[in-house]
């Protein structure tokens, strides 16, 4: 009898152990499946709507529309294609957290139809940490897709913070909180996104401490941070979120009209001066329309942003910041802002109409560019970046989608929602995953060096057909960026390869373009030695691609959008309208 008891007890123990093992194994399998197959695609916002695979970058579409591949990559030669707009307003920002490496952050995502879901991910570990990475807090981000069949770049993120002006912050404006009006925003133009953390740790308290640490590290390098060399002069140039004089002038004008100095004198602009012809792009809280100036008969692009959505998504300051920067700059390779205004429901910005479409579309159709073609476009981008950096402006959103080709074949950089005037460094966590610099991922604070990193990624993508850091999941992309390992094509131009290597240096103090000679170091590289940079600026070089357009108002290089799908924006009340008094 005792033997039977012992035997039965051992069987029961074995059964319990087996049940426990199988239960844990099942839970582990389910968690892994949910994390890999479920949450990441939704949480990253990289796949939005119907998708079809592409081979060697050839774009496909659905329902008769012209498709353009999204930025999610499974293999180097196979991307996800979605029916999308080549709108000038399309872009996205991937969620990043400033928490401790290894800590967990939540993502709450939307699918464009109002549904949301929450996902968790861990911040990639890295040997170097910063003073502000001491808090192990959870941060929640809410994503809203711009449209179900749209580009992954039309996502908008906003913090769960109740303060709408909870915006990006930087070393150069530590008093930003005191300058806020009653309700505030983290604003982006059109369909962009930024992330703001709701960490309980006060980041500003760590700024000075981290500066000392970084300055010591930078002093040990062979290079010198270009921002350190220009710091003194940039202080007098820096402005906080706009020009006060301009704002006062705007207040004196009516909401739907204003006076602008032109070559022929002062012109009084009115919204009625513009005839809307066709929608050429849509975004999260607005659309871009081709329109004609009834007075000059010139074609232009009108970006229309719904104020209710701009406020809801906390994008006020970014929209205003974009307008203020574009109003200040003039360069042959940068989109020109002609006029901006508002009514009781929308914000309006009038730009040059660039009828050739996105460089991204031409690159996907070609698969990859030759070294000569890539050199031409890279040179024009270098010219534009040098100009922006001379004004202490960091662009932060360089990618083929934001490069438009004009009828004459030359580039126009568009979409300045992430651009910002700097004194030293900024802490906004934003960008396109494949183009984000390591210092952004590590939340160290970043400066104009991130634009030179993005240029290296862009040159690589033009030559190879896909970015140097790719993965099915954005977090895999971040890990590869931090590792710095790049797979090189066997037959890549060795001189171009050398330039890319010098641009994709993880230590920003040794990154080409960010040392004491600034952009001159890039312009003197052997890959550009045949160029006369005055000829580049004057557009004297022969473009490698001439868009197929028949007139200045041609829209064949943009997708078609049913006008009936566009619903008028709701008017905002006077309390909300005050946010845009200076627009």
Swiss-Prot record:
SMART domains hit by this protein: S_TK_X (SM00133), S_TKc (SM00220)
- The EC number(s) given in the record are 2.7.11.1
Which residue intervals are annotated with compositional bias (Polar residues) in the record? 52-69, 98-107
Q: Where is the composition biased (Acidic residues)?
A: 163-176, 205-219, 235-256
| Tissue distribution of the protein | Expressed in embryonic mesoderm, and the optic lamina, wing disk and leg disks of third instar larvae. More abundant in adult head than adult body.
Q: Name one GO biological process term.
A: cell adhesion
Q: Where is the composition biased (Low complexity)?
A: 108-162, 181-200
User: Catalyzes what?
Assistant: L-seryl-[protein] + ATP = O-phospho-L-seryl-[protein] + ADP + H(+); L-threonyl-[protein] + ATP = O-phospho-L-threonyl-[protein] + ADP + H(+)
For this entry, the protein name equals cAMP-dependent protein kinase catalytic subunit 3
Gene that specifies this protein: Pka-C3
């Amino acid at each position: 009898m005792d033997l039977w008891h012992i035997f039965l007890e051992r069987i029961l123990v074995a059964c319990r152990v087996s049940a426990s093992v199988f239960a844990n194994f099942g839970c582990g399998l389910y968690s892994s499946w949910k994390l890999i197959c479920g949450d990441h695609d939704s949480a990253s916002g990289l796949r939005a709507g119907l998708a079809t695979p592409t081979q060697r970058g050839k774009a496909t579409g659905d329902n008769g529309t012209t498709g353009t591949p999204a930025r999610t990559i499974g293999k180097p030669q196979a991307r996800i294609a979605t029916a999308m707009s080549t709108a000038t307003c399309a872009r996205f920002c991937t969620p990043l957290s400033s928490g401790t490496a290894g800590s967990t952050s939540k993502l709450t995502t939307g699918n464009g139809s109002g549904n949301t879901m929450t996902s968790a991910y861990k911040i990639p570990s890295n040997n170097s940490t910063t003073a502000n990475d001491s808090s192990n807090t959870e941060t929640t981000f809410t994503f809203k897709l711009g449209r179900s069949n749209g580009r992954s770049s039309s996502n908008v993120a906003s913090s769960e913070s109740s303060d709408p002006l909870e915006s990006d912050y930087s070393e150069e404006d530590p008093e930003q909180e005191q300058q806020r009006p009653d309700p505030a925003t983290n604003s982006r133009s059109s369909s962009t996104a930024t992330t703001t953390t709701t960490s309980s740790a006060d980041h500003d308290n760590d700024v000075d401490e981290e500066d000392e640490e970084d300055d010591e590290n930078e002093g040990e390098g062979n290079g010198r941070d270009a921002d350190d060399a220009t710091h003194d002069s940039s202080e007098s140039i820096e402005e906080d979120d706009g020009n006060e004089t301009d704002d006062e002038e705007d207040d004196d004008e009516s909401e739907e009209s204003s006076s602008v100095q032109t070559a022929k004198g002062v012109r009084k602009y009115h919204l009625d001066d513009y005839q809307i012809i066709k929608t050429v792009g849509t975004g999260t809280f607005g659309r871009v329309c081709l329109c004609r100036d009834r007075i000059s008969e010139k074609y232009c692009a009108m970006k229309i942003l719904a104020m209710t959505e701009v406020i809801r998504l906390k994008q006020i300051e970014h929209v205003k910041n974009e307008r203020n920067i574009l109003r200040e700059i003039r360069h042959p390779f940068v989109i020109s802002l002609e006029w901006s205004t508002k009514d009781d429901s929308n914000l309006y910005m009038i730009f040059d109409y660039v009828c050739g479409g996105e460089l991204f579309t031409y690159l996907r159709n070609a698969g990859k560019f030759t070294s000569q073609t890539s050199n031409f476009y890279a040179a024009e981008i270098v010219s534009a970046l040098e100009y922006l950096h001379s004004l202490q402006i960091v662009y932060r959103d360089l990618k083929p989608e934001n490069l438009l080709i004009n009828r004459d074949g030359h580039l126009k950089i568009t979409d300045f929602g992430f651009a910002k005037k700097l004194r030293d460094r900024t802490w906004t966590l934003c960008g396109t995953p494949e183009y984000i610099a390591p210092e952004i991922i590590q939340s160290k604070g970043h400066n104009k060096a991130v634009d030179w990193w993005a240029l290296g990624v862009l040159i690589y993508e033009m030559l190879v057909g896909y970015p140097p850091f790719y993965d099915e999941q954005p977090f895999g992309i971040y890990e590869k960026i931090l590792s710095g390992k790049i797979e090189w094509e066997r037959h890549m131009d060795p001189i171009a390869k050398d330039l890319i290597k010098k641009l994709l240096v993880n230590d920003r103090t040794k990154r080409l373009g960010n040392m004491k000679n600034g952009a001159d170091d890039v312009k003197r590289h052997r890959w550009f030695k045949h160029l006369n940079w005055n000829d580049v600026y004057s557009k004297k070089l022969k473009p490698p691609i001439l868009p197929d357009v028949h007139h200045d108002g041609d829209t064949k290089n943009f997708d078609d959008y049913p006008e009936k799908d566009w619903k008028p924006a709701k008017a905002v009340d006077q309390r909300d309208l005050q946010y845009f008094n200076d627009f």
